[in-house]
From Swiss-Prot:
Residues found modified as 4-hydroxyproline: 65
UniProt-annotated location(s): Secreted
Protein name: Conotoxin ArMMSK-01
Tissue: Expressed by the venom duct.
This protein's record includes keyword Disulfide bond: yes
Assigned protein family: Belongs to the conotoxin M superfamily.
GO cellular component entries: extracellular region
Pfam families per record: Conotoxin
Alphabetic keyword roster: Cleavage on pair of basic residues, Disulfide bond, Hydroxylation, Neurotoxin, Secreted, Signal, Toxin
Residue numbers covered by the propeptide annotation in the UniProt entry: 21-51
Paired cysteines (S-S): 54-67, 55-63, 59-66
UniProt comment concerning the protein's domains: The cysteine framework is III (CC-C-C-CC). Classified in the M-2 branch, since 2 residues stand between the fourth and the fifth cysteine residues.
Gene Ontology terms for molecular function: ion channel inhibitor activity; toxin activity
Length: 68
């Protein structure tokens, strides 16, 4: 019974390696310096509304967050 579990575990590890799982290291929350830089760039954007703290429509030209 234990050898069958070992074989099954080995097959599963070969088919689904742990490196294939997405890691959360590439999330924006893990890169605060880049987030701050992105916010700074948005605040200088001509469509940025400083009162609402978002970009007026249309905001398809690199200005986030979008006012809706």
């Amino acid at each position: 019974m234990m050898s069958k579990l070992g074989v099954l575990l080995t097959i599963c590890m070969l088919l689904f390696p742990l490196t294939a799982l997405p890691l959360d290291g590439d999330q924006p929350a893990d890169r605060p310096a880049e987030r701050m830089q992105d916010d700074f760039i948005s605040e200088q954007h001509p469509l940025f509304n400083p009162i609402k703290r978002c970009c007026d429509w249309p905001c398809t030209i690199g200005c986030v967050p979008c006012c809706k």
